[in-house]
Amino acid sequence: MGVEEGAGVDKKITIGVCVMEKKVFSAPMGQIMDRIHAFGEFEIIHFGDKVILEDPVESWPICDCLIAFYSSGYPLEKVQAYSSLRKPFLVNELDPQYLLHDRRKVYEHLEMYGIPVPRYACVNRKVPDEDLDYFVEEEDFVEVKGERFWKPFVEKPVNGDDHSIMIYYPSSAGGGMKELFRKVGNRSSEFHPDVRRVRREGSYIYEEFMPTGGTDVKVYTVGPEYAHAEARKSPVVDGVVMRNPDGKEVRYPVLLTPAEKQMAREVCIAFRQAVCGFDLLRSEGSSYVCDVNGWSFVKNSYKYYDDAACVLRKMFLDAKAPHLSSTIPPILPWKINEPVQSNEGLTRQGSGIIGTFGQSEELRCVIAIVRHGDRTPKQKVKLKVTEEKLLNLMLKYNGGKPRAETKLKTAVQLQDLLDATRMLIPRARSGESDSDAEDLEHADKLRQVKAVLEEGGHFSGIYRKVQLKPLKWVNVPKSDGEGEEERPVEALMVLKYGGVLTHAGRKQAEELGRYFRNNMYPGEGTGLLRLHSTYRHDLKIYSSDEGRVQMSAAAFAKGLLDLEGQLTPILVSLVSKDSSMLDGLDNASSEMEAAKAQLNEIITAGSKMVHDHVSSELPWMTDGAGLPPHADEHLPELVKLAKKVTEQVRLLAQDEHENLAEPSAYDVVPPYDQAKALGKSNIDVGRIAAGLPCGSEGFLLMFARWRKLERDLYNERRERFDITQIPDVYDSCKYDLLHNSHLDLKGLDELFKVAQLLADGVIPNEYGINPQQKLKIGSKIARRLLGKILIDLRNTREEAMSVAELKNSQDQVSVSLYSSRKEDRYSQPKLFVKSDELRRPSTGENKEEDDDKETKYRLDPKYANVMTPERHVRTRLYFTSESHIHSLMNVLRYCNLDESLQGEESLVCQSALDRLCKTKELDYMSYVVLRLFENTEISLDDPKRFRIELTFSRGADLSPLEKKDEEAESLLREHTLPIMGPERLQEVGSCLTLETMEKMIRPFAMPAEDFPPPCTPAGFSGYFSKSAAVLERLVKLWPFHKNTSNGKS
């Protein structure tokens, strides 16, 4: 018989715990049930495995309320029978628990209730390996019933109890697959670089991969009015589980936005599971539910255990004894005998942070703009093709349009081109003769194309692409005989390759990340990791579209955050591409062409123009500053030495060339394999020992590289030098000096010295031959980047000021808000506001507070065992190419020369301007860093409260090799140059205020209103919104109160 609902005052409410013993005796369950029991209003009955599995339901204990949830081996149907018989109040209803075992039904149910989920599609198989006509798999996507999912995408078994989840990566990021699984030791995922094809042995859900900044959020509800959220490092990043000294996985409580709280309420109601855990993805300003787990408790949070016990108590009383008061007693029963903790003895050592932290000045923001690491020389082959096979290939991939060009990037497309080229080369060789120089050159170029396409293990679509552009057409009869149609008979083929991050570049980027971790943030390395792991470090990494830049960013992130494993998952998880901000020179192409033309005049005119109006105090103000005197006299020497090196490489390539000339069936050459975008991760000692070029460049391609440079540098027929080739000659010299010194090329040292002398003058002047021109070109190239930097700085200041205002207002509101400190501590926190308030869309007022759609994670201070939860640092890293570094530096150096800023001092001090003038090159891994500090002892309205510190590094230059000492020998063996340390751009002790920085940069930056509007939902900017309601909520949340005894402050 059921128990009457109107239980007497003296009669205790019975709570049946009908759960497998393994779950009953878990620490969180024990902590919460002990607290419920301590109220004295409840009798708790544990059924036990024997009763649940063996006894008939009629003999099971009778209870008023039932806690019952599925786990492995649990007889859910039997428990349903008991529930029908006794009709207890169910904390989690039983029928919907069947839904949780099928991911398809979970997603359908979420959609039915309007809860956002990732875009997905289901592939259902009745038998393993069943072919389905609606499922298509290609190299970089799968298509389900016409809906296409591009890599990266996620593959989940439909069985909710199968935790083997795969993520497949695009070939542009290196390809491969990461398998996620239940934690084994300290691993939660494993990367398989060679797995490209999806599974076919069962039914799967395919869903869009959501970039979340490498963080997972788990939400725990206790009834529809309470939700607690915790974040952890996503297993997608490197698969290493972060654990505390007790061996528990490290998770930190984070604040939910109002919209997310509403989602938690809806999940709880939709599945009728009062105690329910679910996974939340925060991506690009929106939130999505990607899994619902059912009964789940937070681990290792005593504050949460208190809350959960209080909420469940109210739930039980409302269901079975509504006449009894559910008001929480002023002191919780299990707290009565606890000594009050004092904060007096607390130090600030817990966060492991020293340096400026803890003094009056706090680091608030680090912004770094970084050039990519060491790369192979960039190459280009151009040839006109008339061969039918190549023209047909162009038509195959441009949709059959005779006048449309096509780009070949994917492995399949490049394999097609390689097959065609292999067939054409024997024919080309048979027609060779000394008298037919044009045919000979064409055959050589085809061989070069073939050699590039066959170069294995080093390039992918990011690094190697082919463009086919039709040039001539004829009219031919249509295949059906009716009329004529156009057909191309000649096309221009352009093959671009090279520019790959080398093993040295990867090592440099990782080491620079480590350097930043240990030196840019107070705390000697542990400070940053502590901030990051506790969600007080807001990190975003941006990269241009180029593979070498993306991989530099990923390797840097690996060093910065002390990650492990391959770069592909780190790249996809943590690096955002923004080509409009970090790629391209289109905005300044005409000005740069004009600068190059003037530069050509200056060089060919000799020393006369360079040294007109020279100021000994301001040498950088003259046209063409940095060029050597009588620069034109060095050009013949440059050509002569280039010929000498080219001839040596030709002889080295001869053997390779002869071997290729021997007849062999082209089909025995291994097929083109979609190689990894990572470049080489380690130096190939075997190749070096065998006397071969470093990397995967053979002598044939090395010769092609030098022969092209030699020909382009000087046109013998016209007797004309091309000064735009000087940087490329210097680039090749530098690469071979570092990576191919074992080939002992005679004259390479001398060639490098001449090329460096000229390049040191040419390269900076390509971005403007005088400061005014440099400023104009720089502002055009870096306009969007400068705008984003100003947004970053402004957002940081707004957040810091909001926190400061909260602290200042705390004393005024503490009397009313904390008249009873205990009442606040023991009341139900996190209760939701009305849903109509949460559903309000963002208004225009919020636009200025968040000009980008960056995902945010905020530590929840009330539940965090962290000593300084208000401490928060924003880091923004921008990885780009040489052009953007030069452009940014030029704006910082010369912004005061703009008409609108006449009379203003330069942002860069005189001594730094002098050093920069002598710094000829911003080499690989060169960087500019802006650090924003807040002096918390200065008034909020004083501009000096926020100051900027500017530093730069010239990167990994070759100067250490010039000493020819032991260090130089060691560097040559490793093929890796050290990165020069940062140099200040301001005088020591000077104060560049943020206000001044904004005034000086704003004329050259894209205005905030020109950036795309943020797609941030209501609540994301609300963490630090200045509205009265949010201020009040934050004052309640933030533990700034000196006498609080709630954990650590």
From Swiss-Prot:
Any one GO MF annotation of this record: inositol hexakisphosphate 1-kinase activity
Region (Disordered): 835-856
Outcome when changing K218A: Loss of activity
Keyword NAD tagged: no
Biased composition (Basic and acidic residues): 835-846
Keywords from the named record: Acetylation, ATP-binding, Cytoplasm, Kinase, Nucleotide-binding, Phosphoprotein, Transferase
Reactions accelerated catalytically: 1D-myo-inositol hexakisphosphate + ATP = 1-diphospho-1D-myo-inositol 2,3,4,5,6-pentakisphosphate + ADP; 5-diphospho-1D-myo-inositol 1,2,3,4,6-pentakisphosphate + ATP + H(+) = 1,5-bis(diphospho)-1D-myo-inositol 2,3,4,6-tetrakisphosphate + ADP
List of residues that carry N-acetylmethionine: M1
Highest taxon of source: Eukaryota
Region named Polyphosphoinositide-binding domain: 354-428
EC number: 2.7.4.24
GO terms under cellular component: cytosol; plasma membrane; plastid
Binding locations of substrate: K22, K23, R182, K183, K218, R232, S296, F297, V298, K299
In-chain residues carrying the UniProt-annotated modification Phosphoserine: S820
InterPro entries: Acid_Pase_AS, His_Pase_clade-2, His_Pase_VIP1, His_PPase_superfam, VIP1_N
Compartment(s) of residence: Cytoplasm, Cytosol
Binding site for ATP: 103, 156, 163, 182, 207-210, 216-218, 234, 279, 291-293
One GO biological process term: positive regulation of vitamin E biosynthetic process
UniProt cross-references to SUPFAM superfamilies, sorted A to Z: Glutathione synthetase ATP-binding domain-like, Phosphoglycerate mutase-like
Tissue/organ expression: Mostly expressed at low levels in roots and reproductive tissues (e.g. flowers and siliques), and, to a lower extent, in vegetative tissues (e.g. roots, shoots, leaves and stems). Also present in mature pollen.
Keyword Nucleotide-binding attributed: yes
Protein family (similarity comment): Belongs to the histidine acid phosphatase family. VIP1 subfamily.
Function: Bifunctional inositol kinase that acts in concert with the IP6K kinases to synthesize the diphosphate group-containing inositol pyrophosphates diphosphoinositol pentakisphosphate, PP-InsP5, and bis-diphosphoinositol tetrakisphosphate, (PP)2-InsP4. PP-InsP5 and (PP)2-InsP4, also respectively called InsP7 and InsP8, may regulate a variety of cellular processes, including apoptosis, vesicle trafficking, cytoskeletal dynamics, and exocytosis. Phosphorylates inositol hexakisphosphate (InsP6) at position 1 to produce PP-InsP5 which is in turn phosphorylated by IP6Ks to produce (PP)2-InsP4.
UniProt protein name: Inositol hexakisphosphate and diphosphoinositol-pentakisphosphate kinase VIP2
